Amino acid sequence: MDWSNIIFAFSLTLFAGLATGVGGVIAVARKAPGERFLAGSLGFSVGVMLFVSFVEILPKAVEELTGVWGERGGNWAATGAFFAGIALIAVIDRLVPTAINPHEPSTVGGAVEGYERRSRMMRAGVLTAIAISIHNFPEGFATFVAGLTDPRIAIPVAVAIAIHNIPEGIAVAVPIREATGSRGKALKWATLSGLAEPAGAVVGFILLMPFLGPEAMGLSFAAVAGIMVFISLDELLPTAISSGRHHTAIYGLVGGMAVMAVSLLLFI
């Protein structure tokens, strides 16, 4: 077991998780990013995550599993694990009430704007933080596994997840600041919601450690690819397009794919 790889993977996960704190800083400074920038950045994240999932992570899972179970068995196992990852994150997504679900951006704002009392604003912020923490847990596992796999994959994935964590931090910090008048409390809750990602990495590592081998790694890679694809299509792309900058989001998506492709080609 190479502890330097484990530390590297965990550091990337911590970096991605703490990006919610960046969102908190933006919220308390009352300087929100423009719609064009947000659409392009989220679209870029979608491009990176989709491309790396289908071109690098899923094929690597097939390679690991076919080495154990043969071509037919390995391909079936990788496909099953891929859709199991999608099912896992979809179930988590459905368990979170719509009004506080960070994957339902159109309802979050309306719910928060409808609260007239500070106590309800505080409750909205805390519940949003809890909801985001639930969603960030498997994302942390995904980033961690990518870090164990290959830095070429891990760094762009961590950056992509960090980008989409920034608006989540804003969603937590805004109602808490309005409720308490405290920038410190708003920033604290925004940052804490992102710490679920390194927690996901730790739990994933503890669960995987006794089973580290081609089977466990191959199944994990495929499941992580499924998780990343679902997050991209269910959360990031709709959020980017909902800004009203449809073409900017798509240009960002293509740009993310192109950057990811070039970064992989440079290391062949």
From Swiss-Prot:
GO terms for cellular component: plasma membrane. Keywords: Cell membrane, Ion transport, Iron, Membrane, Metal-binding, Transmembrane, Transmembrane helix, Transport, Zinc, Zinc transport. It is found in: Cell membrane. It catalyses: Zn(2+)(in) = Zn(2+)(out). Its main location: membrane. GO terms for molecular function: metal ion binding; zinc ion transmembrane transporter activity. Zn(2+) binds at residues 139, 164, 168. It comes from the Bacteria. It is a multi-pass membrane protein. Pfam families: Zip. InterPro entries: ZIP, Zn_transptr_ZupT. Fe(2+) binds at residues 136, 139, 165, 168, 197. The chain crosses the membrane at residues 6-26, 37-57, 73-93, 126-146, 153-173, 189-209, 211-231, 248-268. The keyword Cell membrane applies. Belongs to the ZIP transporter (TC 2.A.5) family. ZupT subfamily. Mediates zinc uptake. May also transport other divalent cations. This is Zinc transporter ZupT. It comes from Corynebacterium efficiens (strain DSM 44549 / YS-314 / AJ 12310 / JCM 11189 / NBRC 100395). The gene is zupT.
